[in-house]
Amino acid sequence: MNTVKTVRELRAAVARARSEGKRIGFVPTMGNLHAGHAALVKKAGERADFVVVSIFVNPLQFGPSEDLDTYPRTLAADQERLLEAGCHLLFTPTVEEMYPDGMDGQTRIHVPGVSEGLCGASRPGHFEGVATVVSKLLNMVQPDLALFGEKDFQQLAVIRKLVRDLNLPVQIFGEPTVRAADGLALSSRNGYLDEQQRAAAPAIYRTLRQLGERIRAGAEDFPALLADARQALEQAGLRPDYLEIREPISLRPGVPGDRQLVILAAAYLGSTRLIDNLSVHLD
């Protein structure tokens, strides 16, 4: 595995791989990698011949009161995990490399519709930062395919629309959420949880599953279902940010009669905000 820090080095390495007829796969990350990231890299290796991973904690997607300064930087451990997972090229740019003219003057990309509401309402400017950095990275790497985890479901919807609307020549794959044995979705922010909070955290997925089962059983009073689910989260010690039933492509509110739905949740344990989702297929 080769590690590069500049766009010039990145493009040269990718060009060499492409000249050898290799199909390029790409997995963008913010580091502090866990088994979910490793699964994305391994899947990229199944779909492509040359796997590029980026590690960049993107300031543009953090709000002023969020955890940019405290977000864990664990490069040495990340490199070991990526080597084991089959990464060929690691790109670790600085903020100055990504935003050479500073962030205030950086052209930004807004993806309408799917970026609004849910996490977009709770974290103003977040998806603009995500869309901007992903656009830059896709232009830098120019991969044949890129992989993202379905845990960040709204982010995946934003990226799919971004790629479609801007006619970017890349296939986007969403990969299933990797979970701990008790159902908690793996997340770099799980490390912020203390022992008591970690014990309470699986209630998010448990509540989503119970809600999904009720919908599959024919329940159609979505407001009542959501009220019950919010109460279940609160009783488990979580503070819900949002809990919504949506249509999975447009992310419009789901209605009875929709055959494909996704339930999305965000909740706080102390100051740590966790997100999760569950797809519901009514065939």
Swiss-Prot record:
Pathway noted in the entry: Cofactor biosynthesis; (R)-pantothenate biosynthesis; (R)-pantothenate from (R)-pantoate and beta-alanine: step 1/1
Known role: Catalyzes the condensation of pantoate with beta-alanine in an ATP-dependent reaction via a pantoyl-adenylate intermediate.
Record-annotated active site: H37
Gene3D superfamilies noted in UniProt: HUPs (3.40.50.620), Pantoate-beta-alanine ligase, C-terminal domain (3.30.1300.10)
Gene designation: panC
GO MF annotations, alphabetized: ATP binding; pantoate-beta-alanine ligase activity
Further remarks about this protein from its record: The reaction proceeds by a bi uni uni bi ping pong mechanism.
SUPFAM superfamilies the record matches: Nucleotidylyl transferase
Quaternary organization: Homodimer.
Keyword field: ATP-binding, Cytoplasm, Ligase, Nucleotide-binding, Pantothenate biosynthesis
Class of the enzyme per the UniProt entry, highest EC level: ligase
InterPro entries, A to Z: Pantoate_ligase, Pantoate_ligase_C, Rossmann-like_a/b/a_fold
Residues at which beta-alanine binds: Q61
Protein name: Pantothenate synthetase
Recorded catalytic activity of this chain's protein: (R)-pantoate + beta-alanine + ATP = (R)-pantothenate + AMP + diphosphate + H(+)
Binding site for ATP: 30-37, 149-152, 178, 186-189
GO cellular component: cytosol
Organism of derivation: Pseudomonas aeruginosa (strain ATCC 15692 / DSM 22644 / CIP 104116 / JCM 14847 / LMG 12228 / 1C / PRS 101 / PAO1)
Family recorded in the similarity comment: Belongs to the pantothenate synthetase family.
Biological process according to GO: pantothenate biosynthetic process
Residues annotated for (R)-pantoate binding in this entry: Q61, Q155
HAMAP family named in the record: PanC
This enzyme's EC code(s): 6.3.2.1
Intracellular or extracellular location(s): Cytoplasm
